Design a protein with these regions (language model features):
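Extracellular glycoside hydrolase catalytic/binding regions
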Residues: 1-137
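Aromatic/acidic polysaccharide-binding cleft in carbohydrate-active enzymes
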Residues: 110, 130-168
Length: 168
Protein backbone atom coordinates (compact mmCIF):
# COMPACT_ATOMS: atom_id res chain seq x y z
CA UNK A 1 0.00 0.00 0.00
CA UNK A 2 1.27 3.46 -0.87
CA UNK A 3 -0.46 5.45 1.88
CA UNK A 4 2.74 6.76 3.49
CA UNK A 5 4.45 7.30 0.13
CA UNK A 6 1.49 9.29 -1.24
CA UNK A 7 1.24 11.33 1.96
CA UNK A 8 4.99 12.12 1.95
CA UNK A 9 4.82 13.06 -1.73
CA UNK A 10 1.82 15.35 -1.20
CA UNK A 11 3.11 17.00 1.99
CA UNK A 12 6.66 17.53 0.74
CA UNK A 13 5.31 19.07 -2.48
CA UNK A 14 3.10 21.35 -0.40
CA UNK A 15 6.05 22.52 1.73
CA UNK A 16 8.07 23.14 -1.44
CA UNK A 17 5.17 25.14 -2.94
CA UNK A 18 5.39 27.52 0.01
CA UNK A 19 9.19 27.56 0.30
CA UNK A 20 11.07 25.92 -2.58
CA UNK A 21 14.37 26.28 -0.70
CA UNK A 22 13.14 24.51 2.45
CA UNK A 23 14.93 21.20 3.07
CA UNK A 24 12.37 18.41 3.54
CA UNK A 25 12.71 14.92 5.00
CA UNK A 26 10.14 12.30 5.93
CA UNK A 27 11.50 11.58 9.41
CA UNK A 28 10.59 7.90 9.16
CA UNK A 29 12.39 5.00 10.82
CA UNK A 30 13.78 3.90 7.49
CA UNK A 31 12.06 0.53 7.23
CA UNK A 32 12.28 -1.26 3.89
CA UNK A 33 9.71 -3.18 1.86
CA UNK A 34 11.62 -6.13 0.43
CA UNK A 35 8.86 -8.61 1.24
CA UNK A 36 9.07 -11.46 3.74
CA UNK A 37 10.69 -13.94 1.36
CA UNK A 38 13.43 -11.57 0.21
CA UNK A 39 14.15 -10.42 3.78
CA UNK A 40 14.47 -14.09 4.81
CA UNK A 41 16.64 -14.91 1.77
CA UNK A 42 19.02 -12.09 2.74
CA UNK A 43 18.83 -13.15 6.43
CA UNK A 44 17.55 -9.72 7.48
CA UNK A 45 15.21 -8.99 10.42
CA UNK A 46 11.76 -9.34 8.86
CA UNK A 47 10.01 -6.57 10.78
CA UNK A 48 12.47 -3.93 9.55
CA UNK A 49 12.83 -5.15 5.96
CA UNK A 50 9.61 -6.96 4.97
CA UNK A 51 7.27 -4.00 4.57
CA UNK A 52 5.37 -4.94 7.72
CA UNK A 53 5.13 -1.31 8.87
CA UNK A 54 4.00 0.06 5.51
CA UNK A 55 7.22 2.00 4.98
CA UNK A 56 9.45 1.70 1.92
CA UNK A 57 12.62 3.75 2.41
CA UNK A 58 13.79 3.00 -1.14
CA UNK A 59 10.56 4.35 -2.59
CA UNK A 60 10.42 7.39 -0.28
CA UNK A 61 13.87 8.41 -1.50
CA UNK A 62 12.52 8.60 -5.09
CA UNK A 63 10.25 11.53 -4.18
CA UNK A 64 11.86 14.56 -5.80
CA UNK A 65 10.50 16.93 -3.13
CA UNK A 66 12.13 14.92 -0.33
CA UNK A 67 15.67 16.24 0.00
CA UNK A 68 17.41 13.82 2.38
CA UNK A 69 17.04 10.55 4.26
CA UNK A 70 16.69 10.29 8.03
CA UNK A 71 16.76 6.67 9.22
CA UNK A 72 16.50 5.69 12.88
CA UNK A 73 17.80 2.58 14.62
CA UNK A 74 16.86 0.94 17.93
CA UNK A 75 18.54 -2.45 17.94
CA UNK A 76 16.99 -3.75 21.18
CA UNK A 77 13.44 -2.88 20.14
CA UNK A 78 13.85 -4.15 16.60
CA UNK A 79 15.62 -7.42 17.43
CA UNK A 80 18.81 -6.57 15.56
CA UNK A 81 22.00 -8.52 16.19
CA UNK A 82 24.85 -6.22 17.23
CA UNK A 83 27.81 -6.30 14.88
CA UNK A 84 25.68 -7.59 12.01
CA UNK A 85 22.15 -6.28 11.51
CA UNK A 86 23.01 -2.86 12.91
CA UNK A 87 26.02 -2.36 10.63
CA UNK A 88 24.08 -3.55 7.58
CA UNK A 89 21.23 -1.13 8.42
CA UNK A 90 23.54 1.88 8.55
CA UNK A 91 25.40 0.87 5.39
CA UNK A 92 22.27 0.04 3.38
CA UNK A 93 20.64 3.39 4.12
CA UNK A 94 23.72 5.29 2.99
CA UNK A 95 23.74 3.26 -0.22
CA UNK A 96 20.03 3.93 -0.79
CA UNK A 97 20.38 7.69 -0.41
CA UNK A 98 23.59 7.74 -2.43
CA UNK A 99 21.78 5.96 -5.28
CA UNK A 100 19.05 8.61 -5.04
CA UNK A 101 21.74 11.34 -5.02
CA UNK A 102 20.54 12.62 -1.65
CA UNK A 103 22.31 13.28 1.65
CA UNK A 104 21.54 11.32 4.79
CA UNK A 105 21.42 12.06 8.51
CA UNK A 106 21.35 9.27 11.10
CA UNK A 107 18.41 10.99 12.76
CA UNK A 108 17.82 8.85 15.84
CA UNK A 109 19.52 5.86 17.36
CA UNK A 110 19.77 4.17 20.69
CA UNK A 111 20.78 1.07 22.60
CA UNK A 112 19.56 0.45 26.13
CA UNK A 113 22.17 -2.18 27.04
CA UNK A 114 24.76 0.13 28.57
CA UNK A 115 27.36 -2.67 28.78
CA UNK A 116 27.42 -2.79 24.96
CA UNK A 117 26.53 0.79 24.13
CA UNK A 118 29.97 2.46 24.05
CA UNK A 119 31.40 -0.13 21.66
CA UNK A 120 28.28 -0.14 19.48
CA UNK A 121 28.10 3.65 19.28
CA UNK A 122 31.79 3.75 18.38
CA UNK A 123 31.20 1.29 15.53
CA UNK A 124 28.10 3.12 14.33
CA UNK A 125 29.76 6.52 14.35
CA UNK A 126 32.80 5.12 12.54
CA UNK A 127 30.43 4.14 9.73
CA UNK A 128 28.49 7.40 9.84
CA UNK A 129 31.68 9.47 9.60
CA UNK A 130 33.00 7.43 6.68
CA UNK A 131 35.70 5.52 8.54
CA UNK A 132 34.32 2.00 8.04
CA UNK A 133 33.00 1.26 4.55
CA UNK A 134 34.43 2.82 1.40
CA UNK A 135 31.97 5.31 -0.04
CA UNK A 136 29.55 5.18 2.91
CA UNK A 137 29.31 8.50 4.69
CA UNK A 138 26.52 10.36 6.41
CA UNK A 139 26.21 14.12 6.61
CA UNK A 140 25.33 14.09 10.31
CA UNK A 141 23.79 12.23 13.23
CA UNK A 142 21.66 12.84 16.33
CA UNK A 143 21.47 10.83 19.51
CA UNK A 144 17.87 10.10 20.46
CA UNK A 145 18.37 11.66 23.85
CA UNK A 146 21.38 13.52 25.18
CA UNK A 147 21.13 15.13 28.59
CA UNK A 148 23.19 16.57 31.39
CA UNK A 149 22.89 17.75 34.93
CA UNK A 150 19.97 19.86 36.10
CA UNK A 151 20.39 23.12 38.00
CA UNK A 152 20.04 21.24 41.30
CA UNK A 153 23.02 18.98 40.40
CA UNK A 154 20.99 15.84 39.66
CA UNK A 155 20.99 14.09 36.32
CA UNK A 156 18.04 14.50 34.00
CA UNK A 157 15.93 11.35 34.33
CA UNK A 158 16.53 8.55 31.81
CA UNK A 159 12.90 7.86 30.94
CA UNK A 160 13.40 5.25 28.22
CA UNK A 161 16.90 3.84 28.80
CA UNK A 162 18.42 5.58 25.77
CA UNK A 163 19.75 8.75 27.40
CA UNK A 164 23.40 9.61 26.84
CA UNK A 165 24.80 12.00 29.44
CA UNK A 166 27.20 14.80 28.68
CA UNK A 167 29.94 15.85 31.09
CA UNK A 168 29.25 17.90 34.22
Amino acid sequence: DDILYNWAKEMSAYVKSIDPHHMVSVGDEGFYNLGYQEAARQDLPSSAYSGYYGVDFDKLMTIDTVDFGTPHMYVDQWGFDLGDDDLEWIKRHAQTTSSADKPIIFEEFGLTDKTKRDAAYSDWLDIVTGDYYEGVEYQGFNYWMIASYLDDGTLYQDYDGYTVYGPE
